[in-house]
Amino acid sequence: MEQKLFSKLIIEFIERNYPEFIKTIKHQDDGSFDCDLKSDSGFFSIWIATYNSEITIGIEDPTGQNNIHTHISCYEIEDLKSCTTELSKYIENIKADKLILYKDKDGKYDWIESSEFKNQDGSKKFSWKK
């Protein structure tokens, strides 16, 4: 799918479903965009980008790094519904503290399903909520 059309469709989806991201949208020269939303706790942000005609969603950790992310491929217009459903799942799981940011005992940040966190000895978790 062409980059500008892809980004337009994802922005329309975000406007309808997650308008809190809209004020941070930054359009790029290649037709892609990125945006973010700071957590209620203030410790981290969710970020979304549409580089290379795919959705990338991730977490920016408290140090400003955005290495924690995943890619959602959406090559054809027919894939759009499943792609936006997957994007929603990530956003909702992060906001509901089902997918959490944590810092391991070595100081490295990562994300994990909250149900698995109890096995992370010496780690600290960060909640979306205050």
Task: Tell where the protein language model's regions lie, with residue ranges.
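Short secondary-structure junctions
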Residues: 16-28, 101
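Amphipathic alpha-helical segments
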Residues: 2-21
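Intrinsically disordered, low-complexity regulatory segments enriched in Ser/Thr/Pro
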Residues: 41-82, 125-130
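Ser/Thr-rich, low-complexity intrinsically disordered terminal regions
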Residues: 27-37
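Surface-exposed, interaction-prone regions used to assemble/regulate multi-protein complexes
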Residues: 65-81, 85, 89, 93-105
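Acidic, proline/glycine-rich low-complexity IDRs
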Residues: 3-4, 16, 89-130
